[in-house]
Amino acid sequence: MRLGRDMLAPAARLASSRCLGSLARATARKAARSGPDRLLTSRRRFIIDSRRWGRPKTGPNPTDRARPGSKHHIVTDANGTPLAAILTGANVNDVTQLLPLIDAIPPIRGLRGHPLQRPRVVYADRGYDSERHRRALRDRGIEPVIAKRRTEHGSGLGKYRWVVERTHAWLHHFRRLRIRFERRADIHGAFLKLGCCLICWNTLRRADQSL
């Protein structure tokens, strides 16, 4: 999937009238009509990750204490389709956004008679390692697959996490997300969600072309 780097600039006026939730629901409904091998089959496995970038919504950047920064937290399905995105300061611990990301996933129609609103499995890296949050996910009927902090690399989680890494790369093809120009967090957060909407739209467009 290739996304134009400057698509957000002409689309900026849409930020006030578009949101990730409504487009994700429409995408899933269209995919459900396209066949069983489309987006809905991937809602059983979700992957969570975050990336740090400059300017506020801000806290000290952990990688450069002299500069403020912000962080993009996203959750995707197993195909890399973004389902929810949250903007925080760069010094916010990843694990604090685990449950808010799960709660932000928009409800969409599942298979007939078996609506699926929550994932069955969530994959995440060491930044989300917390027994309290594992218990909270299990209480919701979600199986957490989260790397522990002291485990070596190569544990096998990477075969799932590369999907969300790719989605971060797609988002940062957009210059306004790769380089933060906005001082106001709400404006940058709107661009983040608009970027997710464009990825959803591009995914659906390519799925239609393959039919």
Swiss-Prot record:
First and last residue of the signal peptide: none
GO molecular function, one term: transposase activity
NCBIfam families: transpos_IS5_3
Job description of the protein: Involved in the transposition of the insertion sequence.
Keywords: DNA recombination, DNA-binding, Transposable element, Transposition
A biological-process GO annotation: DNA transposition
Protein name per the record: Putative transposase for insertion sequence element IS402
Keyword Chaperone: no
Stretch list, region Disordered: 51-71
Classification of source organism: Bacteria, Pseudomonadati, Pseudomonadota, Betaproteobacteria, Burkholderiales
InterPro entries in the record: Transposase_11
Entry keyword annotation includes DNA-binding: yes
Homology family: Belongs to the transposase 11 family.
